[in-house]
């Protein structure tokens, strides 16, 4: 059976340290003016017991199964690998930027060097190709990120999915993200 990669971001374990962002930049040589991954910090919010609470939201590609970015690409430069990772072939890209406009997660950007769209790809060309986990997962000091093969019932990601309540960002759009969120139980920030 083919691997299908996914990731979980546990908002209860995340401390907003940005180690994942820095590791991503270093591993993938991301220019300073753009990002594949950010952790947005919301807060503080004062809780009823007087303590302060922050909420940490991961902003990156959510690796959709039903990919709006792929379906609008006229040259098939945006595509889904056999392992479910949404990718960009820079050599096929004509720079129309339809994929950036179609992404409801604002996860793509124009690389200032290649002039083509780029996004998180779970470090597929570097770490994943060597049998390692994505850089962001490896450096997280609180283990807030879980990565793995969702087609393997015994994988760590499936064990976490079975044991914790999760949601998928903007799931109502029908995109079927493979990035799952364990929502903040500490009283996150209200919209």
Swiss-Prot record:
Pfam family, one: Fer4_11
Key words, A-Z: 4Fe-4S, Electron transport, Iron, Iron-sulfur, Metal-binding, Oxidoreductase, Repeat, Transport
GO molecular function: 4 iron, 4 sulfur cluster binding; metal ion binding; oxidoreductase activity
Binding site for [4Fe-4S] cluster 1: 14, 17, 20, 140
KW 4Fe-4S (keyword) present: yes
Superkingdom of origin: Bacteria
Sequence positions that bind [4Fe-4S] cluster 2: 24, 120, 123, 136
Residues the record lists as binding [4Fe-4S] cluster 3: 61, 64, 69, 103
Residues where [4Fe-4S] cluster 4 binds: 73, 93, 96, 99
Residue ranges annotated for the 4Fe-4S ferredoxin-type domain, each copy included: 5-34, 50-83, 84-113
Chain's role: Component of the phosphorylative electron transport system with polysulfide as the terminal acceptor.
PANTHER family from the UniProt entry: PROTEIN NRFC, PROTEIN NRFC HOMOLOG
Record note on quaternary structure: Functional polysulfide reductase is made up of three different (A, B, and C) subunits.
Official protein name in the record: Polysulfide reductase chain B
């Amino acid at each position: 059976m083919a691997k299908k990669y996914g990731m979980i971001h546990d908002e209860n374990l995340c401390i907003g340290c940005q180690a994942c962002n820095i590791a991503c930049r270093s591993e993938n040589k991301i220019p300073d003016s753009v990002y594949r991954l950010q952790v947005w910090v919301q807060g503080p919010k004062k809780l009823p017991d007087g303590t302060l609470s922050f909420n940490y939201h991961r902003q990156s590609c959510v690796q959709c199964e039903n990919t709006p970015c792929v379906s609008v690409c006229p040259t098939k430069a945006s595509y889904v690998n056999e392992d479910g990772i949404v990718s960009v072939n820079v050599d096929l890209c004509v720079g129309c930027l339809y994929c950036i406009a179609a992404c409801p997660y604002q996860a793509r950007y124009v690389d200032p060097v290649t002039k083509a769209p780029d996004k998180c790809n779970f470090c597929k060309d570097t770490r994943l190709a060597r049998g390692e986990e994505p850089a962001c997962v490896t450096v997280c000091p609180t283990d807030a990120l879980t990565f793995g093969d969702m087609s393997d019932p015994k994988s760590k990601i499936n064990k976490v999915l079975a044991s914790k309540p999760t949601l998928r960002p903007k799931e109502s759009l029908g995109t079927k993200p493979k990035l799952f969120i364990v929502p903040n139980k500490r009283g996150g920030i209200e919209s």
